[in-house]
Amino acid sequence: MEEFQRHIELDRSWQHNLIYPLIFQEYIYAFAYDHGLNKSILLENASDKKYSLLIVKRLITRMYQQNHSILSANDSNQNEIFGHKQKKNLYSQMITEGFSVIVEIPFFPLLISSLEGKEIVKSQNLRSIHSIFPFLEDKFLYLNYVLGILIPYPAHLEISVQTLRYWLKDASSLHLLRFFLYEYRNWNSLITPKEFISFFSKRNQRLFLFLYNFHVCEYESLFVFLRNQSSYLRSXSFGVLLERIYFYGKVKYLGKNFPKDFRVILWFFKXPFLHYVRYQGTILLASKGTSLLIHKWKYYLIYFWQCDFSVWXQPRRIYINRLSNHSLDFMGFLSSVRMNSSVIRSQMSQNSFLIENIIKKFDXIVPIIPLVGSLAKAKFCNVLGPPISKSAWTDLSDSEIIDRFGHICRKVSHXXSGSSRKKSLYRIKYILRLSCARTLSRKHKSTVRAFLKRLGSEFLEEFFTEEEKVLSLTLPRDSSTSWGFYIYRRRIWYLDVICIHNLTNDE
């Protein structure tokens, strides 16, 4: 952020929300490519304060050149591998990465406020993603229905460009954005979600993730506004929602004619508080209301996406869970509300009777099958679970092998510590430990038993049990409960759980 503040000057074009001239700044591409490719191509004859057509012209020219002898010597090995089409995509991707940095600039509140000398407006509705953990612990028990939604992708990326028009008043930049979108694929055809995700992961991640995040942000801002409007007593109805016109008059009428059942009826019309939670591409709408209310919200969301965003939301991507009967798959946990019944025998005078108490308890379980599948995909075990050696790491030093296994083990431990039952977590740790031992024994051409006997079983223990200093959330603990039982049974929410990547990315 400080680098952007130091380089970007508030000139006349910037004051009019024109970001197109920034495309010809060399330092933009240095920021975008401060890792990976050789930056000598980008920084030749660089000037920090002058606009230059040289860099972009050179890259665009190389996209259409068949003779690539002008590349630097450091790129020669890479160029022998790439064909002409790959080279063309490589140079185009370099421009796209630079454009991705530029198009994000108007959406940096801290940067814009510092350049314009304004204070950041604090939104009252802004919530940290870490508020999901208190929601699961405190609110989940008292809810009846949860509406799970997979956010639909735009059927055509032109929809995202049109939405971006309202925020980015720069026609030249929007035309260049369309050029990048049509460069790689014929976007006239509809995109299935699977193809869309696959395209995200292969190239131009930054640009397309920006468009997707902007699409989600725009949807949320409009949806939250409409949701707040629908909660006011005097607001008009929204199609399938309950009618709220002249609600004060209806309340007075109900109070006069139904004095006994007035509270129940008033609660029904007011619509109980609706919790909104989003994690990545999944949305949860949770309510204490009835099945009728949650179904109305389901169809309202379908119409909302179709009418306001021209997005077709498939009904199979929206599911309704009754928490008393089903588990909720969210953030890698199977969350449910478990009923614990206890019978107490009481006696008054000569009469004795039994009192049955039912206590709701939040239960979160980590499914073991997907975790074992991830380990098998990363070659730590086979599909059935038995550990195997990581042959790709046998060329590394012993300390680096142990450090990698320990790093993955700690990350898995952090991700699964919110579970109420730790048995599956201990099984994953066992697989990683034995896989580490098999990898080391394979490197030294020995058996696992002989290797551990020579170094001792405590050799791996200290690396896998050492915890990183990470902030966590825990519930209050009873002083009479032993610490070992507490660690085994209680849930610990590590705040870095949202930053943990897939196991295959740790290679």
From Swiss-Prot:
Recorded family membership: Belongs to the intron maturase 2 family. MatK subfamily.
Presence of the UniProt keyword Cell cycle in the record: no
Domain of life: Eukaryota
Keywords: Chloroplast, mRNA processing, Plastid, RNA-binding, tRNA processing
GO cellular component: chloroplast
Compartment(s) where it occurs, according to its Swiss-Prot or TrEMBL record: Plastid, Chloroplast
InterPro entries recorded: Domain_X (IPR024937), Maturase_MatK (IPR002866), Maturase_MatK_N (IPR024942)
GO terms of biological process kind: mRNA processing; RNA splicing; tRNA processing
GO terms of molecular function: RNA binding
Plastid recorded as keyword: yes
Function summary: Usually encoded in the trnK tRNA gene intron. Probably assists in splicing its own and other chloroplast group II introns.
Name of a matching Pfam family: MatK_N
Name of this protein: Maturase K
